[in-house]
A protein has these predicted regions:
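Structural signature of alpha-helical solenoid repeat scaffolds
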Residues: 16, 49, 89, 93, ...
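Residue-level detector of extended alpha-helical repeat arrays and alpha-solenoid scaffolds
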Residues: 8, 41, 81, 85, ...
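Conserved hydrophobic register position within alpha-solenoid helical repeats
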Residues: 11, 44, 88, 121, ...
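Short inter-helical turns and helix N-cap capping residues of alpha-solenoid HEAT/ARM repeat scaffolds
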Residues: 3-4, 36-37, 67-69, 81, ...
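Amphipathic alpha-helical scaffolding segments comprising HEAT/armadillo-like alpha-solenoid repeats
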Residues: 1, 20-34, 53-75, 98-110, ...
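Long, ordered, amphipathic alpha-helical scaffolds
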Residues: 115, 126, 147, 154-158, ...
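Extended, low-complexity, acidic/polar intrinsically disordered regions
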Residues: 67, 76-83, 87, 185-191, ...
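Glycine-rich, flexible loop segments associated with nucleotide phosphate handling
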Residues: 3-13, 76-92
Length: 207
């Protein structure tokens, strides 16, 4: 029932946060990735990403293989997509295995009609390849007219640790708390220029 699914979703989320102690749960999470419940599949994908479960790559790629017109199509009578593409894409980025088959599955989602999906795809490609063009795509989304999209791009830049975007992050029309979270991501996840001192000074200016 609905209540059981809610419990299962919470369990999948909790498993992701218990990494690496939850490695034994990976087979169950892979099974859950095939569940009929959208929320369960989403929670399982996020947990697999948090666990950096490289054995999940094939299943995640299979879920996305039909591209924006398949996995990324909107369900009938629902705002949801056929598959939880945002979570699936982000899981591949968090697992962090840069292989041609993964890149080939992710790249078509850069053309998805929903900017949140485009942001997730750019984040994943940035995490996997480190190529500046994907960071620049995320910076462009910081100017999007919808606040929800700007928020997502902030979080995606932070998750990818792309330090060249720090000034654009600081200037984004969004809550300072989110900008601080994104900048903290640059400090924790990123390396190179600018250095930590410049990033921390930028954070201080937002406090």
């Amino acid at each position: 029932g609905v209540e059981e699914n809610a419990v299962a979703r919470n369990a999948a989320r909790a498993l992701g946060k218990l990494a690496p102690a939850a490695q034994t749960a990976i087979p169950d999470l892979l099974d859950t990735l095939q569940d009929a419940d959208d929320g369960l599949r989403e929670a399982a994908a996020r947990a697999l990403g948090q666990l950096a479960a490289s054995e999940a790559i094939e299943a995640l790629c299979e879920k996305l293989a039909s591209g924006p017109a398949g996995a990324g199509a909107q369900q009938a009578n629902s705002p949801r997509l056929v598959e939880p593409c945002e979570a699936l894409l982000e899981a591949l980025g968090d697992i962090g295995v840069n292989e041609p088959r993964v890149l080939a599955v992710v790249k078509p989602f850069l053309e998805h009609e929903r900017p949140l999906i485009r942001s997730a795809a750019a984040r994943t490609l940035l995490q996997l390849s480190g190529e500046a063009r994907w960071g620049e795509l995320l910076v462009d989304l910081l100017d999007h007219p919808q606040l929800q999209v700007r928020r997502a791009a902030l979080m995606d830049l932070g998750a990818a640790g792309w330090r060249p975007g720090f000034q654009a992050i600081a200037a984004t029309l969004a809550e300072n708390s989110l900008k601080l979270m994104a900048l903290r991501g640059l400090v924790e996840q990123g390396n190179g220029d600018p250095g930590d001192e410049a990033l921390l000074a930028c954070m201080d200016a937002l406090l």
